[in-house]
């Protein structure tokens, strides 16, 4: 396994400075932001797609720093009911897939997106319950008319270029748990899989280790981010919490640096399960911790994971 980082947290640094800092911190890889919600802080993706020389130079810059690119990330909502937003997010997704092919990266990360409740909707509508029946009808319409047709088309577009699409199971979007991830994969193709981020699963009451096992063969990329559950607030209000992330004292849960939500034993079990299932790729740190600075959160995550990830190939079992 290798250790990397999702580079959004270093958006204020230049590409060269960011790469230098990542290498000096002991990382092996970077996950490059390719538009939509993460932005494009280190590379103007549309410009790179238009120029093979520019794309080659970008890749060479990363490699010269002693790093590799684990994935291109364009987390967005190409199914947004606002046509302008959907068009922009779709274009950024397509550009990320094209650039990935050009620079020899085989994973592009996204969200599944979430449509509205009809073709006349203005805002996404994330369904969390089956009744009244309106909600079941909305969910069925979203999947049958929007989610599956769109991603079946995009899965083919990516497959034709040798690219795998890794979806982050994230509340607010149609793929948010194990069964919705599997439904998308089964409906659209084997190059559809997961960017596995356990933080979004904890507060839903899921066991990430059980989810990992169910997704064997469909884990394309991994995020290292934790989630701290506030027991008092959860017992009072439950976990469907729409308060601002900055309202830490009142929220039922918050994202946090690895080790600050779940201890070493969970993360040791997590990387062990990944290896059992055949994943030996990059573990990419994602910093979203409202209680720490970028540098402190990143530094603590690197130190924590360095002692946990498995970096060497397992030895032959001479005892078996």
Q: What kind of region is each of these model predictions?
A:
Residues 1-12:
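Boundary/entry segment of secreted carbohydrate-active catalytic domains
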Residues 27, 67, 100, 105, ...:
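A structural motif
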């Amino acid at each position: 396994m290798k250790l990397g980082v999702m580079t959004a947290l270093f958006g204020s640094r230049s590409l060269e400075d960011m790469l230098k800092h990542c290498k000096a911190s002991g990382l092996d890889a970077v996950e490059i932001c390719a538009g939509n919600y993460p932005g494009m802080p280190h590379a103007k993706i549309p410009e790179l797609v238009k120029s093979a020389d520019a794309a080659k130079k970008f890749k060479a810059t990363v490699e010269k720093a002693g790093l590799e690119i684990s994935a291109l990330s364009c987390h967005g909502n190409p199914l947004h009911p606002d046509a302008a937003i959907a068009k922009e997010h779709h274009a950024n997704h397509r550009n990320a897939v094209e650039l990935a092919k050009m620079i020899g990266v085989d994973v592009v990360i996204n969200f599944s997106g979430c449509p509205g409740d009809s073709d006349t909707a203005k805002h996404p509508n994330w369904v969390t319950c089956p009744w009244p029946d309106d909600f079941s009808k909305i969910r069925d319409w979203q999947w049958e008319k929007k989610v599956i047709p769109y991603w079946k088309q995009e899965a083919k577009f990516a497959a034709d270029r040798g690219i795998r699409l890794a979806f982050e199971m994230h509340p607010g979007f149609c793929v948010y748990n194990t069964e919705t991830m599997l439904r998308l994969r089964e409906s659209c193709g084997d190059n559809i899989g997961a960017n596995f981020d356990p933080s979004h699963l904890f507060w839903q009451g899921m066991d990430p280790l059980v989810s990992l096992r169910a997704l064997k063969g469909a884990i394309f990329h991994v995020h290292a981010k934790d989630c701290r559950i506030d027991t008092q607030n959860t017992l009072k209000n439950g976990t469907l919490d729409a308060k601002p992330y900055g309202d830490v004292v009142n929220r039922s849960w918050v994202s946090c640096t690895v080790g600050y939500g779940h201890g070493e034993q969970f993360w040791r079990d997590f990387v062990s399960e990944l290896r059992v299932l055949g994943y030996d790729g990059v573990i990419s740190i994602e910093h979203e911790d409202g209680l720490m600075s970028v540098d402190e959160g990143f530094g603590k995550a690197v130190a924590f994971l360095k002692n946990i990830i498995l970096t060497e190939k397992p030895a032959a079992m001479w005892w078996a």
